[in-house]
A protein has these predicted regions:
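Short hydrophobic/aromatic patches at helix-to-coil boundaries
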Residues: 29, 101-105
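Solvent-exposed loop/turn segments at secondary-structure junctions
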Residues: 44-46, 105
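Axial heme c-ligation environment in periplasmic c-type cytochrome domains
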Residues: 38, 47-58, 70-101
Length: 105
């Protein structure tokens, strides 16, 4: 009985981990296509902060999505260290999608 429960629980955990919405996959592809991964990664700091660090820092901040989308478009500096993030050639809609993807981590 315990073995069945353990097997079922493990199976559910694996299946849940494998479920990624098509929208999230598209937003991840957008982040890669726009070159963001040259400076950022999901789990570790490269030139800029890890996406998970960004999500953690802005968790619960109702204005974070708009603030970060503007930084993606216009660039920014001083929040994560001395190296500035340059402006990016993305539309406002693309920036919002990318930020939503990052904040969902």
């Amino acid at each position: 009985m315990k073995l069945r429960l353990l097997t079922a629980t493990a199976g559910i955990a694996v299946a849940t981990a494998m479920l990624v919405s098509p929208a999230a996959m598209a937003d991840e592809a957008l982040v890669k296509a726009k070159g963001c991964t040259a400076c950022h990664a999901n789990e570790k700091k490269l030139v800029g902060p890890a996406y998970k660090e960004v999500a953690k820092k802005y968790k619960g901040d109702a204005g974070a999505a708009a603030k970060l989308a503007e930084k993606v478009v216009k660039g920014g500096q001083g929040v994560w260290g001395p190296i500035p993030m340059p402006p990016n050639k993305v539309t406002d809609d693309e920036a919002k999608k990318m930020v939503a993807y990052i904040l969902a981590m």
